[in-house]
UniProtKB/Swiss-Prot annotation:
<keyword id="KW-0812">Transmembrane</keyword>
<keyword id="KW-1133">Transmembrane helix</keyword>
<dbReference type="InterPro" id="IPR023025">
    <property type="entry name" value="Ser_Thr_transp_SstT"/>
</dbReference>
<dbReference type="GO" id="GO:0005886">
    <property type="term" value="C:plasma membrane"/>
</dbReference>
<keyword id="KW-0997">Cell inner membrane</keyword>
<comment type="function">
    <text>Involved in the import of serine and threonine into the cell, with the concomitant import of sodium (symport system).</text>
</comment>
<keyword id="KW-0472">Membrane</keyword>
<dbReference type="GO" id="GO:0032329">
    <property type="term" value="P:serine transport"/>
</dbReference>
<protein>
    <recommendedName>
        <fullName>Serine/threonine transporter SstT</fullName>
    </recommendedName>
</protein>
<feature type="transmembrane region" description="Helical">
    <location>
        <begin position="193"/>
        <end position="213"/>
    </location>
</feature>
<keyword id="KW-0813">Transport</keyword>
<comment type="similarity">
    <text>Belongs to the dicarboxylate/amino acid:cation symporter (DAACS) (TC 2.A.23) family.</text>
</comment>
<dbReference type="GO" id="GO:0005295">
    <property type="term" value="F:neutral L-amino acid:sodium symporter activity"/>
</dbReference>
<feature type="transmembrane region" description="Helical">
    <location>
        <begin position="217"/>
        <end position="237"/>
    </location>
</feature>
<dbReference type="Pfam" id="PF00375">
    <property type="entry name" value="SDF"/>
</dbReference>
<feature type="transmembrane region" description="Helical">
    <location>
        <begin position="21"/>
        <end position="41"/>
    </location>
</feature>
<feature type="transmembrane region" description="Helical">
    <location>
        <begin position="45"/>
        <end position="65"/>
    </location>
</feature>
Length: 418
């Protein structure tokens, strides 16, 4: 009996997180089908899990970045520049794919009058201005509001200043960073329960019947995201590491993408991505900066959403689009996507900005945004899964390109699963 109990407890504490998440996923679906009321009640588990991740993520980013820069040794190599290039290349490539697929399989929308009091950004300059304003935010305000651009700016500044501090001070900062990491690991162990609650409550609240009317649009959107995740990203990774990219890609989708799909928050998934980078033995000086930065500017999924929904509105209204305009839309969508994390409503609220390129009135553009919110159950989940998993994929690719010793047929084989 004791052996049975210890075996069960061992599975809970040290077992594969992915397998446990799968159990939670199936249990959530079953509960939603059996009892709507019970499914809505367990939604609290999902709310608590996402809340815990969002609470710990800003502190984790601040401490990790500050500790890694403060303890950085002169001449030690990092891969931030190549990763930034991969982020921008991936986002622009995603926008191009979305344009191509939207022309091959044009979508149309049934636009109904929809009043909305949400203010969309007025232009690209406004989006970029908001991004720059995030850099100079008050540090306490940045932590409280999960402003990762501001947190990164302060962490880098304090880290550089602390490089001249006493060794005991650096050791204290490092110990604090390790302590926060332990808290993060504990929170992540509750992922199966959190996802059980999220799946059960989401299915009970919305079901999937409401999505059937937008089946074609969803197929185009999710098809683009799958194409980027399974074809474009592997091609970029292969170009970078010159090896079979799929073991790395599938490992990242499995470990990072699955969790991000259900939490629907790149910020909440930062601790998961950090832990995965640690399991792959990547350079902490690199991933402690690139992962939170990726959660802010690496937005391939957002670029796809902006492009597909904008072109759906264009096709619905019968507006002709030539090739140069389509290419310009790709650039605009990529730039907008990089600022999506700083806009309330994310990628959907940047659609009116892209629609403005084609002279579409704001009233109609906001109706397109309303359609986006209707399909958000799947659209936002798939978008976040692509965005967040790509952060780890490109970080790992850049690190492996710089250090061939990190290459492994199974990227996570060197250590046990979380």
């Amino acid at each position: 009996m004791e052996n049975t109990q210890s075996g069960f407890i061992g599975f809970i504490i040290r077992g594969s997180l992915v397998k446990q998440i799968l159990v939670g996923l199936i249990a959530g679906i079953i509960l939603a089908l059996v009892s709507t009321q019970a499914a809505l009640a367990v939604g609290l588990l999902g709310t608590l899990f996402v809340g815990a991740l969002k609470a710990v993520a800003p502190v984790l980013v601040l401490m990790l970045v500050m500790a890694s820069i403060a303890n950085h040794k002169q001449g030690q190599k990092t891969s931030i520049r190549p990763i930034l290039f991969l982020y921008l290349l991936g986002t622009f490539s995603a926008a191009l794919i979305a344009v191509a697929v939207s022309f091959m399989f044009p979508s149309t929308l049934v636009l109904a009058t929809q009043n909305s009091d949400i203010a969309a950004p007025g232009g690209i300059v406004e989006v970029l201005k908001g991004l720059l304003n995030s850099v100079i935010a008050n540090p306490i305000h940045a932590l409280l509001n999960a402003n990762y651009i501001g947190i990164l700016a302060w962490a880098v500044g304090l880290g550089i200043a602390l490089r001249h501090a006493a060794d005991t001070t650096k050791a204290l900062i490092n110990d604090m960073s390790n302590a926060v990491t332990v808290v993060v690991r504990v929170v992540i162990r509750f992922a199966p329960l959190g996802i059980f609650g999220l799946v059960a409550s989401t299915m009970a609240e919305t079901g999937f019947g409401v999505l059937l009317g937008y089946a074609h649009l969803l197929v185009v959107l999710i098809g683009c995201m799958l194409l980027v995740a399974l074809v474009v990203n592997p091609l970029i990774v292969y170009w970078k590491i010159r090896r079979n990219p799929y073991p790395l890609v599938f490992a990242c989708l499995r470990e990072s993408g699955v969790t991000a799909f259900f939490t629907r928050s790149s910020a909440a998934n930062i601790p998961v991505n950090m832990e995965m980078c640690k399991k792959m033995n990547l350079n902490e000086d690199t991933y402690s900066v690139s992962i939170p930065l990726g959660a802010t500017i690496n937005m391939a999924g957002a670029a796809i959403t902006i492009t597909v929904l904008t072109l759906a509105a264009v096709h619905t209204l019968g507006i002709a689009v030539d090739l140069p305009t389509a290419l310009l839309l790709s650039v605009v969508a990529a730039i907008c996507a990089c600022g999506a994390s700083g806009v309330a409503g994310g990628s959907l609220l940047l659609i009116p900005l892209a629609c403005g390129m084609f002279g579409i009135p704001n009233e109609i553009a906001m109706q397109v945004v309303a359609v986006g919110f209707i399909i958000g159950v799947l659209q936002d989940s798939a978008e976040t899964a692509l965005n967040s998993s790509t952060d780890v994929i490109f970080t790992a690719a850049a690190c492996q390109a710089d250090d061939a010793r990190l290459a492994n047929p199974d990227p996570l084989a060197s250590r046990k699963s979380v």
